[in-house]
From Swiss-Prot:
InterPro entries per the UniProt record, alphabetical: Ribosomal_uL18_bac-type, Ribosomal_uL18_bac/euk
An MF annotation (GO) of this entry: structural constituent of ribosome
Gene that encodes it: rplR
Cited Gene3D superfamilies: 3.30.420.100
Coiled coil (residue ranges): none
Keyword Lyase: no
Its biological purpose: This is one of the proteins that bind and probably mediate the attachment of the 5S RNA into the large ribosomal subunit, where it forms part of the central protuberance.
GO BP terms, alphabetized: translation
Record protein name field: Large ribosomal subunit protein uL18
Pfam families: Ribosomal_L18p
Keyword RNA-binding: yes
Similarity-based family: Belongs to the universal ribosomal protein uL18 family.
Length: 121
């Protein structure tokens, strides 16, 4: 019997295999209790084109005095920031890799904010 974490990692591997066959850049998300991380990785998986996280000093100033990166507002800020960085790197279309996390809460907020900022997926 697989633990919850093993199940999530298994889903993540299967998703990455499917995305790799598409050959487009992927927007990958990692979520911890304190922070949320997002990066855009090239279609062949060898290069990070853009990255953003709530651990960055500029983002912590933007999300408020508390500096908490583990909430929906912080995820929205990261979604907007990663979309801006990806567009600056010349990436318009990505595949969304949620790394096995449920499409709910912070993950959904990040995805919606990235879409609103102009990324297509």
């Amino acid at each position: 019997m697989l633990t919850k974490k093993e199940q999530r990692l298994r889903r993540s591997r299967q998703t990455r295999i499917r995305i790799a066959t598409q050959g487009v850049a992927r927007l990958t998300v990692n979520r911890t209790n304190l922070h949320i991380y997002a990066s855009v990785i090239s279609g062949d998986g060898t290069k990070v084109l853009a990255a953003a996280s709530t651990a960055e000093v500029e983002v912590r100033k933007e999300i408020g005095a508390s500096g908490k990166g583990g909430n929906v507002a912080a995820a929205q800020a990261i979604g907007k920031r990663i979309a801006e960085k990806a567009k600056a790197a010349g990436v318009e279309k990505v595949a969304f890799d949620r790394a096995g996390f449920a499409y709910h809460g912070r993950v959904k907020a990040l995805a919606d904010a990235a879409r609103e900022a102009g990324l297509q997926f």
